[in-house]
Amino acid sequence: MPAREVYLKRPATRRQLEGICTRYDGQQRITQLDCEEGCSKRTQPPQRLNPRYKSPDLIHISFIIVLLCILSMTSSVVAQTTTGSSSSKAAATPILPRQTLPTTISLPPLNISHPVLQLALPPTSSLYLTFSICSLTSNATILPTVLISTSSPASFNLGSKPIRDASTGGIPTSSGGKGYNYKSGRNGATWGLKWSSGFGNWTLNGTSETQVHLLLGLGLGNDGSTLNTTGVGNGNVVVQMGASTSGPLHALSAVYPLLGDTTSTSALIFSPLLYSSPQPEPSYPNYTLPGAQLAFPDFSYSEPLNSSLSSNLTLIVVPTNASPTSTDLGNSICAINAASANSSVSGANNTILKSFQPEWMTVGDEQGFRSYWVLGDLAEQGNYTAWVSDDKGVLSQPAWFATKPAGFPCQLVMPNDVCPNLGYSAPLDANSTAVTSPSGATISPTSPIQTLPDDLLELIVQNLEAFSTSLLSHACGRDLFSHVSSCLDCYSAYRDWLCRIVVPQCGAANSTSGATVIETATSTSTSSGTFPTPSTVLRTPSSPRNPSLPIPAYSYYELLPCMSTCNRADRSCPVSMGIRCPKRKVNAAKSYAFVGDDHSYGDGSAAQGVAAQDRWGNRWCNG
């Protein structure tokens, strides 16, 4: 079938919008879009035209309409000419007008009937392209090949020995990706896009204007001409492309949402650490420790963030069985948005509580600012996938969590000014304040506990004040105290230990069938496959953890504190403060969780090889 040429036609007047002129077998067909006058029917050679308008407000919308019309008309044409040379294909390639940049568009679908698409971008010295796979065919293993050329004429032959090219894009494995893009040799001008779970990117940073050509295909070989559509499957592959000359419109962050904890129908989720803000170290001679009730600093929007995410975040949560991660599209923002549109459990109808700006806390063993969300009306023992995205187009890595079984008795407790390390379920009386959605439906019959009960609060405050008074009698702020820690380190470690002992964390009933010691662990907690089994023990009103503390009115399984919480306080504080931790081979298993009998390994700290939580926030001990 002879190839068709598609190009933009220059208008006769500045007020006109260009027509799309198509020449096929020497006969020209003209499709007009809002032309004030008829388009000329003279045969015109293909050319790239810069549109002119009196009304700048219409430029962006008008050119997107033109581009989409061009692409929809040419996708089938290009697919039928894939056996031709690269140069001949480029001659009939539609050009994205410069005025549409920056823009995000969904390209015409690729399928068994139309497996190839080619287009060109306007000459530029700087270009940032991002790609997301919105959907796959019935054969989810077939990903579209994306070849990029800056040569003239375009050549899409990647060669038999392409090299990695980190300078143009791709996502390194250290950031949750699958590697960098490929390039056709050190001085080559052809690149192959490397997909990372449905996301890819490519960047041009040159010194002179260059025209960029793209060739996308299903079953397309790296030579840009071999096409094998066997096994492509039914349905469409849809790719969303973002193009800009000033910076990428979409990006991936290597960080994850952090799970606080779940109940049977609710979940507490924190953002990644946005801004690290350790407590300021006092100095001698005016060495003063923080009060029992901390004065939290305000979040400063002018401070540089520790995360590639901005502070304006949106939480996205969908059931895992409806998640694009099931087809390895967990980094595709358009696939995630489609799943969220159909199955979201993180919208207004599921939100019990959320922060309006980042707040200071010490969850995740890090001092600094995070945002949080509490979701309700979730399924019992449900599996969910979560992301956070920001207003700059940056997407986090996906995190997975599960809700507890029916009958789970404990309540979610939020970080507060006395115990900023909380953020989990605890055996406290329920806050019976019901939460309803904007439509009036009940999201949850209870609310998270934001202030501790008076008896627990008074107990913690009294202990902190007494400990502070005793600690300040030492040589705080002077070399005589310690070469490795300070009085503030000691006081902070004691606060962390005290809060976890007085406000224990609840665990699931089926964790270890009552066992309190984990015998083996072969890896750090960053590997979910070898993550230690949560260490829980049954607590009842008749056999509480500590009879001198307020006793819950119901039975629950306690997730034991990590041995590291006691060890940290022991190491940081003077011997005279009297902090002593139990021995592993003696009686430590009654009160603390650890791995093995070697005191130098597995206490729940990252320094000892098995951190308390994995990268998503799932814990095997409370620490």
UniProtKB/Swiss-Prot annotation:
Disruption phenotype: Growth defect during endoplasmic reticulum stress induced by tunicamycin, fluconazole or ketoconazole. Sensitive to conditions of low calcium. Sensitive to oxidative stress induced by hydrogen peroxide during conditions of low calcium. It comes from the Eukaryota. Residues 1-57 are extracellular. The keyword Transmembrane applies. It holds the Pfam family Mid1. Keywords: Calcium, Calcium channel, Calcium transport, Cell membrane, Disulfide bond, Ion channel, Ion transport, Membrane, Transmembrane, Transmembrane helix, Transport. GO terms for biological process: calcium ion import across plasma membrane. Calcium-permeable, cation-selective stretch-activated channel (SAC) that functions together with CCH1 to mediate calcium entry into cells. May additionally play a role in cellular detoxification of radicals. This is Stretch-activated cation channel MID1. The gene is MID1.
